[in-house]
């Protein structure tokens, strides 16, 4: 049975542990589809809306801007609302954002992208902390599980976005909107944790913590490394399908190639398991 940190909220029985893990995995699977579903449809969106490459570049960059801003402000939200409630709010933001960008307006395409990007940013920041707090003795296993689920979510979204968009019942807006079903389901699965996971009692001063980080050489090195890694990842996520299509491959094939590149990330579960031994 997985053991939880005694200083964290007590998960208790196996069913409650299983529900918490399920909630974590459902949050994880929602942190990539809203992003991965766009890349294969860039050409379709361009043809439908008349947006230029620079405007489409802005569309794919908005979530990254949200990540940078929200990541720094997340401690303020967890201090006020607690980690579980903040994650619940993040899932609602993802859902609202996905639905908003499916409205037949160019402006809502950008507004919805920003909203979903903010929600994803909260999830990116809080999931590792949540796992470390509640499963300190099994954090490697849980981390590998949710990391693999994230890769599966990205691969699935990248692969089926074009087939959905080519279906007259969906279109490209419907292909983007369909992921709101998954994020809304995750919200209801996670909701019980809002009452079960207690807020941490001790908090460091936000400004003092930021000053300490700003003066840390190690923090800057890690930030630069992770920033470059994320830059490469999201460029691939957003533009590889369009590049392949410009080389003569059809949209469906390009989407599945992106899906393959993301799906290989699920093998990290096996890698982490061996490393853990």
Model-assigned labels for residue ranges:
Residues 36, 64-72, 154-155, 262-270:
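Residue-level signature of mid-helix packing/kink "hotspots" within the transmembrane helices
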Residues 69-107:
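Conserved MFS/SLC helix-loop-helix module at the cytosolic interface between two early adjacent transmembrane helices
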Residues 113-148:
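Cytoplasmic helix-loop-helix junction between adjacent transmembrane helices
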Residues 19-53, 71-74, 236-241:
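Extracytoplasmic
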């Amino acid at each position: 049975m997985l053991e939880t940190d005694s200083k964290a909220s007590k998960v208790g029985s196996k069913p409650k542990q299983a529900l918490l893990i399920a909630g974590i995995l459902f949050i994880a699977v929602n942190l990539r589809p809203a992003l991965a579903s766009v890349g294969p449809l860039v050409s379709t969106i361009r043809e439908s809306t008349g947006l230029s490459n620079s405007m489409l570049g802005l569309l794919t960059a908005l979530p990254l801007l949200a990540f940078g801003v929200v990541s720094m402000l997340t401690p303020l939200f967890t201090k006020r609302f607690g980690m579980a409630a903040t994650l619940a709010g993040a899932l609602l933001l993802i859902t609202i954002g996905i639905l908003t960008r499916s409205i037949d307006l160019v402006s809502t395409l950008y507004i919805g992208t920003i909203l979903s990007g903010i929600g994803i940013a909260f999830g990116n920041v809080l999931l590792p902390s949540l796992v470390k707090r509640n499963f300190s003795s099994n954090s490697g296993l849980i981390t590998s599980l949710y990391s693999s689920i994230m890769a599966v979510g990205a691969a699935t979204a990248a692969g089926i976005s074009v087939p959905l968009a080519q279906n007259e019942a969906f279109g490209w807006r419907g292909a983007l909107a369909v992921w709101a079903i998954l994020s809304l389901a995750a919200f209801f699965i996670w909701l019980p944790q809002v009452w079960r996971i207690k807020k941490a009692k001790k908090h460091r001063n936000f400004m003092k913590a930021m000053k300490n980080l700003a003066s840390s050489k190690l923090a800057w090195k890690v930030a630069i490394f992770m920033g470059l890694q994320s830059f490469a990842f999201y460029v691939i996520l957003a533009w590889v399908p369009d590049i392949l299509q410009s080389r003569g491959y059809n949209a469906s094939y390009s989407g599945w190639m992106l899906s393959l590149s993301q799906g290989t990330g699920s093998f990290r579960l096996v890698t982490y398991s061996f490393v853990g031994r």
